[in-house]
Amino acid sequence: RNIRSRGGGPGQFNYFQQIDVNEDTGLIFMLTTSGKINVYEMETGKFLYDIKIPDKETAQFAMLNDTLVATFMLNSSGQQKERIYISSQKENILNTFYRSDLFEVKSGTRWLMMSGIDRYMFRYKDLICYKEFYNDTLFVVTEKELQPRYIFDLGKYSIPIDCRMEACDGDWKTYNTIAAPYIRNQVIETDSLLFMPYNYWAGEKQRERHMVLYDKKAKE
């Protein structure tokens, strides 16, 4: 089936950033580059309605229900205090969750490290889960709060703030050296296991891909 078409009319889009799906209600949510989320019927591809999101630089999103949106913001400037907005179909911001790991970039330039496989939000059953690469905690996102679900203690492999690419202010040579000992991990949850793919931030081992499995029942 086709999901609408390119263009500027209702339900159309030029480009899209991400898709979310609610299999229970049979809806597809498409984050477009026009600041809207287009909603389509999964079975037919029919356009139903759109949802305006806050006029912010949204990196990713997840639907808490069919009209309530959680949008995630990257901290490319070092001073992006807001990390997640909860908003309604009419663009009203209902809640904001803040970050505390702020830093200064001397030049004032905004730097961004992001790839197409990065995933900050995912679904597990009826939960919306969220984890940043720079954060050791996986949260469950609700309208009212971020609920800690898992804490991943990376110990000596957790990257310090001043070793982040954004904090190095474009000095790739320095970054490639000081960030090399640290790892970044993602999380995928199933009923029995946590899958944690990881790789090093920089250096010779950056392209190597590793995987850790955690047995939820055995707790090991």
Where are these predicted regions, by residue range?
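Repeated scaffold domains used in trafficking and secretory/extracellular systems
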Residues: 12-20, 55-64, 116-119, 182-185
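Long, internal scaffold/assembly segments composed of regular secondary structure
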Residues: 95, 106-123, 127-131, 142-143
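Surface-exposed loop/turn elements that mediate protein-protein interactions on large endomembrane-trafficking
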Residues: 1-5, 36-54, 81-106, 110, ...
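N-terminal regulatory/sensing modules of transcriptional regulators
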Residues: 45, 62-63, 68-69, 89, ...
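Blade-loop segments of beta-propeller domains
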Residues: 1-26
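Short beta-strand elements that form the blades of beta-propeller/WD-repeat-like
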Residues: 1, 26-32, 66-78, 85, ...
